[in-house]
A protein has these predicted regions:
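Sec-dependent N-terminal signal peptides
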Residues: 4-13
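Sec/Tat signal peptide C-region and signal peptidase I cleavage site
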Residues: 15-19
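Flexible, processing/modification-adjacent segments and terminal tails
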Residues: 22-25, 30-33, 40, 45-46, ...
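Short hydrophobic/aromatic-rich beta-strand segments that constitute the beta-sheet cores
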Residues: 41, 68-72, 86-90, 140-142, ...
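Hydrophobic lipid-interacting interfaces of membrane-associated proteins
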Residues: 44, 75, 179-181
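Short, surface-exposed coil-to-beta transition loops
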Residues: 54-57, 74-76, 82, 155-160, ...
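An acidic-aromatic
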Residues: 59-110, 183-184
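Gly/Pro-enriched, hydrophobic low-complexity segments
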Residues: 130-193
């Protein structure tokens, strides 16, 4: 009886993973033929201790196979992923890391590489990724797992939330949650080339 229950639970999980991967592949199918994707970006920085949010405008540039750039205020603020290298520029000061050294960015890199390949990379086996779908919106939540309490304290972000419009294949938003607030990028005016 226990074996039967275990097999049934395993089968259900496998079926759910396959369905989630299929939803994701449909949502990002448009990226399969696009080499470059551009959009207008709006960045909202929210700090719990501050009453007003800081809002700025910029651009999103995505290039296959693994480059994502969100540039704000003429380059003073930038979030850049080039393969496994991540560069964050805040008020002109650069901070660089890689997904090989900084594990919180591993799944983030895999998800974006999968988006840019039109879903060719399988994301269903990522242990720190959950997906949900409501109407035309597919939400991907990456919650990085720390190896120790010390590593958890050093993490810049507690989670990343991406929303994709399944009808238009557009990445609608990227939210990076951190202690005491969040940074959210919303995107519009897409051009697929």
């Amino acid at each position: 009886m226990k074996r039967l229950f275990l097999l049934l639970a395993l089968f259900c999980q496998l079926t759910i993973s396959v369905a989630q991967q299929a939803d994701f592949q449909k949502a990002v199918a448009k990226y399969k033929t696009a080499k470059t994707v551009t959009a207008t970006a709006t960045k909202t920085s929210h700090k719990n201790a501050v009453a007003d949010d800081v809002v700025s405008k910029g651009t999103l540039l995505m290039k296959a196979p693994a480059e994502v750039s969100i540039t704000m205020e003429g380059g003073k603020d930038q979030l850049l992923m080039q393969g496994s290298t991540f560069t964050m520029t805040v008020k002109g000061k650069k901070h660089t890391t890689s997904s090989e050294k900084n594990t919180q960015f591993r799944s983030f890199q895999t998800v974006f590489e999968s988006i840019l390949s039109g879903g060719a990379k399988d994301i269903s086996k990522l242990g720190d990724l959950t997906t949900s779908k409501q109407g035309n919106i597919l939400q991907l939540t990456i919650t990085p797992q720390a190896d120790s309490k010390k590593a958890a304290r050093r993490m810049m972000f507690s989670s990343f939330v991406l929303t994709i419009d399944t009808k238009t294949s557009e990445l609608k938003s990227l939210r990076m949650n951190e202690r005491g607030g969040y940074t959210e990028y919303t995107f519009s005016g897409y051009q697929f080339k």
